[in-house]
């Protein structure tokens, strides 16, 4: 199937990404499956963090953890004005709600992932942040710079 393309006027209405930002993404082989996530500088794709792979994860969980990791990293460096791009509306919503609303079944094989989720949720509850969380407009801009390139 071909992806719908945007007209020049639609692209113009969306504008361009802010390159003074970081971008986060996750990759998951299978659902659930082996999941990893990372964050990069948007302008040059320099990797800031890479975590995983974690067994029995989901893409949404990875996107959520990547966003929280990015927020915490920027806060620790006093860079609270730098935007963070995600291509996951689900993860953006979960961060706003401070809750990873996954239906994934957890057992001994993915307990580490559950611990990470709880840690991320607690961090969101105990900390405030000012970084704008922005939607990466894939249809206008192509794949997010943090993409793992495995599609």
Question: Where do the PLM segments sit?
Answer:
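N-terminal accessory interaction module
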Residues: 1-3
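RNase H catalytic domain
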Residues: 29-31, 72-150
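Flexible, glycine- and charge-enriched loops at secondary-structure boundaries
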Residues: 56-60, 64, 106, 110-113
């Amino acid at each position: 199937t071909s992806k719908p393309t945007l007209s020049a006027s639609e692209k113009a209405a969306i504008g361009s990404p802010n390159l003074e930002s970081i971008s986060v993404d996750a990759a998951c082989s299978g659902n659930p499956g082996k999941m990893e996530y990372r964050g990069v500088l948007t302008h040059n794709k320099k990797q800031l963090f890479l975590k995983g792979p974690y067994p029995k994860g989901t893409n949404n969980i990875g996107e959520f953890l990547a966003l929280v990791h990015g927020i915490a990293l920027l806060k620790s460096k006093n860079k609270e004005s730098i935007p963070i791009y995600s291509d996951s509306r689900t993860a953006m919503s979960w961060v706003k709600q401070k809750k990873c609303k996954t239906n994934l079944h957890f057992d001994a094989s993915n307990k580490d992932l559950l611990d990470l989720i709880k840690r991320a949720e607690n961090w969101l509850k105990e900390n405030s942040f000012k970084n704008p969380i922005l939607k990466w407009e894939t249809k206008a801009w192509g794949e997010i710079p943090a993409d793992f390139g495995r599609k």
